[in-house]
Amino acid sequence: MALLQISEPGMAPAPHQRRLAVGIDLGTTNSLVAAVRNSIPEALPDDTGRVLLPSVVRYLEKGGRRIGHAAKEEAAIDPRNTIVSVKRFMGRGKAEVEGAANAPYEFVDAPGMVQIRTVDGVKSPVEVSAEILATLRQRAEDTLGDDLVGAVITVPAYFDDAQRQATKDAARLAGLNVLRLLNEPTAAAIAYGLDNGAEGLYAVYDLGGGTFDLSILKLTKGVFEVLAAGGDSALGGDDFDHLLFAHVLVQAGLDAAALAPEDVRLLLDRVRGVKEALSAAQQAQLDVKLSTGEKLVQTITRDTFAALVEPLVQRTLAPTRKALRDARVSAADIKGVVLVGGATRMPVIRDAVEKYFGQPPLVNLDPDQVVALGAAIQADLLAGNRSGGDDWLLLDVIPLSLGVETMGGLVEKIIPRNSTIPVARAQEFTTFKDGQTAMAIHVVQGERELVSDCRSLARFELRGIPPMAAGAARIRVTYQVDADGLLSVFAREQHSGVEASVVVKPSYGLGDDDIARMLEDSFKTAEVDMRARALREAQVEAQRLVEATEAALAADGDLLDASERATVEALVASLRALAPGDDANAIDAATKALAEGTDEFAARRMNKSIKRALAGRKLDEI
């Protein structure tokens, strides 16, 4: 396809200066590393030829550890010290993960991100992920024969700021230079688009082990533009496993709480094997012997499994509908649907996608590898290993709006959701009170109109504002989201030049369904939110006018006779009494009455100020 030429700093001008960079898919179930070799992206195998590395780490006493296949094989005998699906814990707090389905771990009550107690001490998800990333880095350096200059690491499009920051921290801990965090659906589109010369509108349906993303992309002459993104950061293949696990226990008359942790892990592993077998066969047999000596033997059909997981399949279609709506396109406009993630091998998923979009999904690239391959292509570009006609432009988006709290607990959106990144947007605000010398900046994320209904990301203060009349100061607040989707906020008072800033690093991320719930709530409650916003705005304006009028009466009350002053004071009292109420129309009417009732007073104050300014001056001096 014809490709768009762009310039990146540090591009290698000659082949012999080629720098080694890789793409890494840090997955919930499996991870892998890929690189561009001889102009072709390929997944790099380990010394036994296996490409996929199970995302499993087992901690041993005295600092020992097993990573990948060895850890997975020993998970059933030491479940408490063998961490699986750690990606689900990235950027999460203890309260959010303690109820994780059938998790055998001891979670530690520590501030910030969740911690897990092992025989080798307390470990964070960042440390566990770093073990996996370090293993992949070593594999790449052994295969490629040199040190890496950097890596592009993929993350779910619906990962929030905390989860992205945790991923970057894990990479640094693993000794990796992060060239870019790349959204997984976008990486898949790169691999598919460049491989097939595709153009047009495409949907990327990405169902991994622990997350689901749906992105709508427009591919045109080397430009990959993400029109909209939707998803569920706590829905993946693991959830299908747990549903089947629960079904097996019900059929056997067993209670999960009564099972030994090693039996839970063993049974989950065997259930996952049944799920995978049903992708190729109409039925599969579960045959497992528990530590108690009890043997479970069950035959599970593909139809039984499909009926069991139908609610989860429908959960993937809700974000799909939202993404199409946000992109202002219909399912019929989509030229192709790219499947990503091992969970998309399930026939129930492929059938649902085909039915919804009215066309068979595109499956000519390995769904387990396509994300890493796309990341490798992007890494090769960012490392400077490009040649003529080998560039493209990525236009990715943020999944939720970013805003700031204004007077009255309202949210002023600075960057709306589905804005292309990197992006910087600025807006001016002013002071509310006379002589105000500081301003609190409260950064929030979400789609609702009130701060109380959105997620708080960060707070900081701008101090040193010169004392001025209310409304005279000009504070410019700038929001900047980088190519990794990470946010920084800057505030500057325009007259004095005083500045303050914050790099947003929340202690941990959104809850399991918070992002989807935020969007759903914003649609369901739009009318209520707007009424609430109108009321808050009316109350804020009423308070401002009452305070301004009282200050004017204190300063220049002698400009009014007794009758006029009594009228103004009555209007002030009426507005002050109405302001705390919930009748926005009544507050607006009282505000208007006070404003009109003080017009003559304002004119007299203006004349007084003019006379004072002109006193003692001659006409030719003016």
From Swiss-Prot:
The answer to whether UniProt assigns keyword ATP-binding to this entry is yes
Kindly list the GO molecular function terms attached to this UniProt entry: ATP binding; ATP hydrolysis activity; ATP-dependent protein folding chaperone; unfolded protein binding
* GO terms of biological process kind: iron-sulfur cluster assembly
InterPro entries linked: ATPase_NBD (IPR043129), Heat_shock_70_CS (IPR018181), HSP70_C_sf (IPR029048), HSP70_peptide-bd_sf (IPR029047), Hsp_70_fam (IPR013126), ISC_FeS_clus_asmbl_HscA (IPR010236)
Q: Which Pfam families match?
A: HSP70
* Gene3D superfamilies tied to this protein: 1.20.1270.10, 3.30.420.40, Actin, Chain A, domain 4, Substrate Binding Domain Of DNAk, Chain A, domain 1
Q: Mind listing the UniProt keywords for this protein, alphabetically?
A: ATP-binding, Chaperone, Nucleotide-binding
Recorded superkingdom: Bacteria
The text of the family note is:
Belongs to the heat shock protein 70 family.
Q: Return the NCBIfam families for the record.
A: HscA, PRK05183.1
Alphabetized PANTHER family for the sequence: HEAT SHOCK PROTEIN 70KDA
What this protein is reported to do is described as: Chaperone involved in the maturation of iron-sulfur cluster-containing proteins. Has a low intrinsic ATPase activity which is markedly stimulated by HscB.
Name the UniProt record assigns to this protein = Chaperone protein HscA homolog
Task: Tell me what organism the protein belongs to.
Answer: Burkholderia thailandensis (strain ATCC 700388 / DSM 13276 / CCUG 48851 / CIP 106301 / E264)
